[in-house]
Amino acid sequence: MLYNKLITIAALLVPALAAPQGLDVRDCDYTCGSHCYSASAVSDAQSAGYQLYSAGQSVGRSRYPHQYRNYEGFNFPVSGNYYEWPILSSGSTYNGGSPGADRVVFNDNDELAGLITHTGASGNGFVACSGW
């Protein structure tokens, strides 16, 4: 009788264990080095940077957002004056301190130009993140 109960319990548990759990799955629309960013995270970072830009304000020692001069010659899908703003792998909004390696680039019309990173670049240069 105990054996029958164990079989019944095991039969009920197996499908429950095999069922997908509520894993924290992140959309990976862009990849900068080993960091993965969703489109909404990029949009949030861009919005934070553009709000400061349009208000004539900046934060941090490097005064972000600041103009990005595109010395690397990226072929961005939008034109205009470009500005760079840190996007943090923690998901937090940059508010000063270390900016990390990854940047959102937008123009003066608040259009996303792309994502770039210092990771894998020589010197203080940038390379393109994948996904744009």
Swiss-Prot record:
Signal peptide feature range: 1-26
GO molecular function annotation: lyase activity; ribonuclease T1 activity; RNA binding; RNA endonuclease activity
Key words of the record: Disulfide bond, Endonuclease, Hydrolase, Lyase, Nuclease, Secreted, Signal
Catalyzed reactions per annotation: [RNA] containing guanosine + H2O = an [RNA fragment]-3'-guanosine-3'-phosphate + a 5'-hydroxy-ribonucleotide-3'-[RNA fragment]
One Pfam short name: Ribonuclease
GO CC, any one term: extracellular region
Transmembrane segments: none
Disulfide cross-links: 28-36, 32-129
Catalytic residue positions: 66, 84 (proton acceptor), 118 (proton donor)
Subcellular location: Secreted
Primary localisation category: secreted
Gene3D superfamilies on file: Microbial ribonucleases
EC number(s) from the headed UniProt entry: 4.6.1.24
Family per similarity comment: Belongs to the ribonuclease N1/T1 family.
Identification of the protein by name: Guanyl-specific ribonuclease C2
Organism from which the protein derives: Aspergillus clavatus (strain ATCC 1007 / CBS 513.65 / DSM 816 / NCTC 3887 / NRRL 1 / QM 1276 / 107)
Organism lineage: Eukaryota, Fungi, Dikarya, Ascomycota, Pezizomycotina
